[in-house]
Regions:
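Catalytic cores of nucleotide-sugar-dependent glycosyltransferases that transfer UDP/GDP/TDP-activated
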Residues: 2-407
Length: 407
């Protein structure tokens, strides 16, 4: 359409008139596109699925896109997202991204959705919505009033439903394990969710107290959600501790992961510890920085991913394409992959990638990775977070593997 508008305007000789006409045509086209009647024209008559999602990218985005490739063969998938920077709700066709409706008013979208034949609602992630608890009520309203009497499926990519600090890192920067000296409310009063004040307020919105937060989420799980899909047994145990009444609704369905060829590591003398993925505080940046202070001369730490303010004596590879992981592991002569996350990751693609390549792997005894690493013959589960001690535990583990390989 942009080409058509430019072609029409090209015929107008007066520049000022041409600019006004272009602006008028562009505004008219945007209004036509951003119209629910135009939007509904994209429906094919198949069953409709509503996919409620955040707009923050990351592993949740990867999961959504993989699911859309499967679901779009059977459903018209409508994806609802909230963009905090613009304060706009976006409703898009996941199977046809050219159709999009945007509005500041969620009630407009809710009223529209109640009038079409939605068969399923997937609550994939609500992090950074304007008010998460209000959004839970919107989803409940759509379920009650929708023509299709939809089933509601919740996906547990993080722990937002337990605490707005969705990785369960407390005000002291440590994994809380659902407890804090003085209680959750004391932690919550001091907890900073972002260095950016606007982001901090967005992430805290709808959460006056943790007690009220869990009451509203508990009501959603009990009265709105028909199933709760989690990706690992250890994560289910955490959810059940917070909400014992939901146990019968939980289904454990691990992510499907890409299989990689085995990495072929050449003989070498030094020890190379690979930290796989983008490393933030909750992903273990503090652990890596402390290890770097006591790194022996023959031991290297390589972050395959990104890490801000990394110590000078570690290597940061930067962004990478997942399909090239075996070659990258071979380039750095990887001896072991270390997953330093200090929060209970709900799945961890990087853990599966390392196992798929046949590499030794180490992680802390927290969350989904620990369960898989404990069953892996080349896995090391570190029972406490003590970076100085952990570094030499990893080094000793690599040395023992080398001795076994010589036998």
């Amino acid at each position: 359409m942009k080409t058509v508008i430019n072609a029409v305007c090209f015929l107008i000789p007066v520049a000022s008139v041409r600019r006004r006409l272009r602006h008028h045509l562009q505004q008219g086209w945007r209004a036509h596109k951003n119209n629910l009647m135009t939007f509904v024209g994209g429906l094919t008559g198949r069953d409709i699925m509503l996919w409620v999602d955040h707009a923050l990218g990351g592993g949740t985005e990867v999961y959504s896109k993989r699911q859309f490739k499967i679901l779009c063969k059977k459903y018209d998938v409508l994806r609802l997202q909230y963009f905090p920077k613009t304060e706009l709700y976006h409703l898009t066709f996941a199977c046809n991204k050219h159709r999009i409706y945007t509005t500041h008013n969620i009630d407009e979208i809710a009223d529209f959705l109640c009038g079409i034949n939605i068969r399923q609602i997937v609550v994939n992630n609500l992090v950074a919505y304007k008010s998460t608890t209000d959004m839970l009520n919107v989803i409940a309203r759509i379920k009650r009033n929708c023509m299709g009497m939809p089933q509601v499926s919740f996906r547990g990519h993080d722990f937002q439903s337990i605490c707005p600090s969705f990785n369960l890192v407390n005000c002291d920067g440590k994994y809380c394990d659902l407890s804090y000296v003085g209680g959750c409310e004391k932690c919550w009063a001091q907890k900073k969710l972002s260095d950016n004040p606007i982001s901090h307020n967005v992430l805290k919105s709808g959460a006056g107290t943790i007690c009220e937060w869990r009451r509203q989420w508990g009501n959603f799980f009990t009265n709105t959600a028909d199933e709760i899909i989690l990706f690992a047994e250890p994560i289910a145990k955490i959810f059940i501790r917070a909400y014992p009444e939901i146990e019968q609704k939980i289904k454990i369905i691990p992510h499907t992961v890409q299989n990689y060829r085995a990495a072929k590591i050449k003989p070498h003398d030094d020890i190379n510890i690979i930290v796989l993925g983008n490393i933030s505080h909750q992903k273990g940046a503090g652990v890596i920085c402390q290890m770097a202070q006591h790194l022996p001369d023959n031991v290297n730490i390589i972050v395959v991913g990104e890490m801000k303010n990394a110590p000078d004596n570690i290597t940061v590879h930067g962004k990478y394409k997942a399909k090239k992981l075996p070659q990258i592991m071979e380039k750095y002569n990887a001896d072991i992959v270390f997953i330093p996350s200090i929060w209970p990751e709900t799945f961890s693609y990087t853990t599966s990638e390392a196992i798929s390549m046949g590499l030794p792997i180490a992680c802390f005894d927290i969350g989904a990775p620990a369960g898989r690493v404990a069953k892996y013959k080349r896995g090391l589960v570190l029972t406490e977070i003590n970076p100085d001690k952990n570094l030499f535990q990893i080094i000793d583990f690599v040395k023992n593997l080398r001795q076994e390989n010589k036998k």
